Amino acid sequence: MFIYFRKETDHLKRMGAFSCNLSALDQEQRKRHDILAKDLFPKHLEVRELPDGYGFRFPNDRSLFTALSEWATLEQLCCPFLTLTLELEHDQGPIWLRATGRDGVKDFLRLEPGI
């Protein structure tokens, strides 16, 4: 999820300047971010379209929530234009990770595989 090297296209130019800055992460952080993404995102149960982005539903699991929190912290460093929200639903309900933002962010996210 969240592939960072994108070809610049007319569509992306129209969306605005959304690009992830991988240099915001040091080598160790980048490696950890990649490991977390590869481990976590196959575990999502649902992708839900939102007015300004996407929501990803995960099973309720304490270690999964902790790992998603770590991933979101690293993601925010390189993609500060994203609003990332983690939510635990009541009564042991699922975890929701929401990736949202200003106009154009949803189109940017839509380019990701699996969305």
Predicted region positions:
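Secretory/periplasmic and organellar redox-cofactor proteins
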Residues: 1-66, 85-115
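A common structural junction motif
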Residues: 73-82, 113-115
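Amphipathic, interaction-prone secondary-structure segments
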Residues: 65-69, 73
